[in-house]
Amino acid sequence: MKLAVYGKGGIGKSTTSCNISVALAKRGKKVLQIGCDPKHDSTFTLTGHLIPTIIDTLQEKDFHYEDIWPEDVIYKGYAGVDCVEAGGPPAGAGCGGYVVGETVKLLKELNAFDEYDIILFDVLGDVVCGGFASPLNYADYCLIVTDNGFDALFAANRIAASVREKARTHQLRLAGLIGNRTTKSDLIEKYTENVPIPILQLLPLIEDIRISRVKGKTLFEMSESNPELSPICDYYLNIADQILAKPEGIIPNEVLDRDLFTLLSDFYLNMDSSESSNLTLV
C-alpha cells in the first residue's frame, strides 16, 4: 500500500507522517517513508539526524544509477521504519519536483517498492505542480493534514482538486483529513459539510508534539521514557488502523476557489456577529 501525505507548508506533515509510519510499524508492517522536500527533514524524528539525500548520493556517484545500491540511499529509523530523502537542487536553481520523480525512478530500479508493506510519501507543502504531484501517480490513498484555519483548508481544497484529477487515470482515493493542532474544529466541519471528506483524526494542540520535532524523536520513542504520552500515540495508531482497514476512500469534488473564500469568510463573519450579539445581551 502506498500513501501520499500532503498539506499546507508548516502544518506538521512531517511530524504527523513519522508518527503514522511508526504506528504502522507497530502494527507489524514493513514501512518505508520517503521525504519529498528539498529541506530533506521529513525523516528527522525517525533517524534523529538529517540523512544524506538521493541527490547527494547521485552526485557522489557522478549520476551513475547503476552504481547505487539500496543501502546507499535507505537508512534505518526508529521502530524499523526505513527512510529515504529525495533532497533537491540548490536554492534558486533547478526543479524540486523533478528530483521527486527521479527518486521514485531510482527506487523502482532498485526494486525497493516491492520490499515494503507500506510506502509513505511525505510531500512538500501545498505545491501540486506536476513534479510534486507525482507521488499521487503511485499512491493508493492521499491523506491531507490541515488545521482549523482558512489558509490550511484552502490548501486542502487545492490538494483535493489534484486528487480528483489524478483519479481519472490512477487507482487513487482520498482517505481523509487529519486535523492537526486543532483546539477547535468548527471550520473543518464547515468545509467537510460542503466537500464531503472523511475526518480520520483530530489531533489537539499538544506541546509535546511540537517538542518531539525539536528533540528529533517520534511521540512513540518519547513515550518509552514518559508513559504519560501513550494516549497521544493512540491518535496515530487510530489513523494507522483506519488505513490498514483499506477504507473505500473518495474522489473529492472540491469547491471553486472563489466559493471557498465566500464560504469560509461568511462563516467567520457570522461567528463574529454572533459573538458581538452575545456580548451586547450580556
Curated annotation (Swiss-Prot):
Single GO MF annotation: metal ion binding
Positions bound to [4Fe-4S] cluster: 95, 129
Major location category of this protein: plastid
Gene3D superfamilies per the UniProt record, alphabetical: P-loop containing nucleotide triphosphate hydrolases
Family: Belongs to the NifH/BchL/ChlL family.
Function: Component of the dark-operative protochlorophyllide reductase (DPOR) that uses Mg-ATP and reduced ferredoxin to reduce ring D of protochlorophyllide (Pchlide) to form chlorophyllide a (Chlide). This reaction is light-independent. The L component serves as a unique electron donor to the NB-component of the complex, and binds Mg-ATP.
Signal peptide: none
ATP-binding as UniProt keyword: yes
Binding site for ATP: 10-15, 39, 180-181
InterPro entries attached to this UniProt entry: NifH/chlL_CS, NifH/frxC, P-loop_NTPase, Protochlorophyllide_ATP-bd
Name the record gives this protein: Light-independent protochlorophyllide reductase iron-sulfur ATP-binding protein
Catalytic activities: chlorophyllide a + oxidized 2[4Fe-4S]-[ferredoxin] + 2 ADP + 2 phosphate = protochlorophyllide a + reduced 2[4Fe-4S]-[ferredoxin] + 2 ATP + 2 H2O
Subcellular location: Plastid, Cyanelle
Cofactor: [4Fe-4S] cluster
Assembly and interaction partners: Homodimer. Protochlorophyllide reductase is composed of three subunits; ChlL, ChlN and ChlB.
Matching NCBIfam families: DPOR_bchL (TIGR01281)
Residues engaged in binding Mg(2+): 14
Cofactor-binding details, from the entry: Binds 1 [4Fe-4S] cluster per dimer.
Keyword tags: 4Fe-4S, ATP-binding, Bacteriochlorophyll biosynthesis, Chlorophyll biosynthesis, Cyanelle, Iron, Iron-sulfur, Magnesium, Metal-binding, Nucleotide-binding, Oxidoreductase, Photosynthesis, Plastid
